[in-house]
């Protein structure tokens, strides 16, 4: 079925999730009657390099638009996507560089903890919240991530961190 992907990061910054909600949600705002999936915006935040700081609670980042500071936590990201009214929302995840195994494991664990918090924060029965599998280029970490997330009981899953600096051979 045709589906549109919208990005929470960009919509959060401009025009703002609450404004979109007041205008009737993404479907009405975009004039799209079919399913809409919103990405958490995690990839965009992590691509900001010098404009972001990650900790176990979330991510502090500066807007690429005006330099203003914002804090993404799992709860903020879920609330934003709920306000947007997407049919499918994604948890906040940490997109780590793929080659550093120790950091890939750390980021994977953080993503799992954020996924648990996202599930607790999620309130819309009419919106599916998906978990995101991570683990860099390491097959065993990817398998561990998939097992951990499926045990949490998400209705769907995405594969995160692909095409984030790995070679074709990886």
Where does each model-flagged region fall?
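Non-catalytic, usually N-terminal nucleic-acid engagement modules in DNA/RNA processing proteins
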Residues: 1-123
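Glycine-rich phosphate/ribose-binding loops and adjacent secondary-structure elements
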Residues: 109, 121-170
């Amino acid at each position: 079925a045709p589906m549109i992907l919208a990005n929470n990061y960009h919509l959060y910054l401009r025009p703002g999730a609450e404004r979109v909600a007041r205008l009737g949600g993404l479907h009405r705002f975009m004039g799209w009657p079919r399913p809409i999936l919103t990405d958490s915006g995690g990839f965009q935040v992590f691509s900001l390099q010098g404009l972001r700081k990650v900790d176990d609670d979330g991510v502090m980042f500066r807007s690429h638009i005006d330099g203003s500071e914002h804090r993404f936590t799992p709860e903020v990201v879920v609330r934003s996507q709920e306000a947007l009214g997407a049919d499918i929302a994604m948890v906040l995840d940490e997109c780590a560089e793929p080659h550093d195994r120790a950091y890939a494991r750390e980021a994977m664990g953080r993503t799992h903890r954020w996924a648990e918090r996202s599930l607790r924060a999620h309130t819309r029965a009419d919106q599916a919240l998906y978990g995101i599998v991570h683990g860099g280029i390491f097959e065993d970490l990817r398998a561990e991530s998939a097992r951990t997330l499926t045990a949490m009981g998400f209705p769907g899953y995405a594969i995160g961190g692909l095409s984030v600096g790995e070679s074709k051979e990886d």
